[in-house]
Amino acid sequence: MSILLYFFFLPVILSLIFMKKFKDSKRNLPPSPPKLPIIGNLHQLRGLFHRCLHDLSKKHGPVLLLRLGFIDMVVISSKEAAEEVLKVHDLECCTRPKTNASSKFSRDGKDIAFAPYGEVSRELRKLSLINFFSTQKVRSFRYIREEENDLMVKKLKESAKKKNTVDLSQTLFYLVGSIIFRATFGQRLDQNKHVNKEKIEELMFEVQKVGSLSSSDIFPAGVGWFMDFVSGRHKTLHKVFVEVDTLLNHVIDGHLKNPEDKTNQDRPDIIDSILETIYKQEQDESFKLTIDHLKGIIQNIYLAGVDTSAITMIWAMAELVKNPRVMKKAQEEIRTCIGIKQKERIEEEDVDKLQYLKLVIKETLRLHPPAPLLLPRETMADIKIQGYDIPRKTILLVNAWSIGRNPELWENPEEFNPERFIDCPMDYKGNSFEMLPFGSGRKICPGIAFGIATVELGLLNLLYYFDWRLAEEDKDIDMEEAGDATIVKKVPLELVPIIHH
């Protein structure tokens, strides 16, 4: 059967290849590594994707064309090219490519991250900025961040008294997960009978795993579908989606049926805000939110929010332990500015005094952007980038990791040196194309303020209350990376906390 299918599809594939080559010969396309028939450059993409693309760009140039099966992908690895994509041609490049996984998990474009550019994406982004990520709303969740950090400190003190080694990676993922769960659902993570820490971590891992490009995305419909069917990809994708959807149904239904379970009755959470908007729009003729939009938004907030904030804190702590001079300077600033805290917990307003801590976070984001390739974009029209023709419906990837380590932009780029940002106007909010941890333009991450507030307070608590050392058996910290869309430390960060008196 498979041999018959091969002979049936072969003429179709060869015809498509010929037509593509004829069109490409008339354009000034970006440089590209040598390709193989049908698979294109797929055979050259080994190892961590962002590092592989970094190496290919060093060899072929900062605007690099790759052919993945039957789709074109352009990789951007310079500040100048990134500015053209994200600023000059932002409008022509502000939609997302439609893939099997993104269509499934976004419920066909009903979320913030993957909605195609248009009325839906604009309304969802406006809704998120007003109701969830505005300065006022971020500040309203301050009590959650302070309470959850206080709980983390108490648990770490128990471990410190016993001189136990702590898995700080797990601790920080749980901290951020708890903060976002409370802000979203109005109850503590450990209070929901349908949710547990291990299940959420497992689902987050599974979603990332099935979220990459599949054969259906890069080969003609029949061929790609058949390859995914044989490999079990369709079945796995559906299974993970059902698990995520079931989890969301449980927490949303519980929220609606048992409002008394909420930790803080008098303070609206994110679901409250979305439901209120849905009710208000019932009589409105314009764009209407549905439960699918609600699920898509929650999924974006939780999956993206937990990963990025926790990963940033983990890399920051790893770099600080690896660089004791920087650690000492950060702790001295924190302990001098805050003074002695007896019974009361650290408050978020304390962060405003800590300029060096902010530099540490900025340097961490330069070296370790949590999503090194950002989220993919797709051109909606023919454009030119650095003089090269970029056809419509080309996937664009901006390698923020590569730009952040470019020796033409940064002195000693591999060195962790927060002082490089003293009196430096560069920021991480999409205005400086030398570092783009959250992207830029119309598709910039809307949750920057919430994420940075979480990271600042988390690191402040870790560095104020504790000194840190490696476990006896460890001589150094393994900084090897792992992951797909987001990049974590491959080996969990295990440290011994010592209570600072």
From Swiss-Prot:
What EC numbers are recorded for this enzyme?
1.14.-.-
InterPro entries documented for this protein: Cyt_P450, Cyt_P450_CS, Cyt_P450_E_grp-I, Cyt_P450_sf
What Gene Ontology cellular component terms go with this record?
membrane
- Which coenzymes or cofactors are required? heme
Membrane topology designation: Single-pass membrane protein
Q: Where does heme bind?
A: 445
Q: Which Gene3D superfamilies match?
A: Cytochrome P450 (1.10.630.10)
Which of UniProt's keywords are assigned here? Heme, Iron, Membrane, Metal-binding, Monooxygenase, Oxidoreductase, Transmembrane, Transmembrane helix
Locate the transmembrane regions by residue number: 2-22
- The residues forming a coiled coil are none
UniProt xrefs under Pfam families: p450
Broadest EC class assigned to this enzyme = oxidoreductase
Molecular function terms, GO-annotated: heme binding; iron ion binding; monooxygenase activity; oxidoreductase activity, acting on paired donors, with incorporation or reduction of molecular oxygen
Q: Where in the cell is it found?
A: Membrane
The principal location of this protein is: membrane
Similarity section: Belongs to the cytochrome P450 family.
What name has this protein been given in UniProt? Cytochrome P450 71B3
Organism of provenance: Arabidopsis thaliana (Mouse-ear cress)
Q: Which gene encodes it?
A: CYP71B3
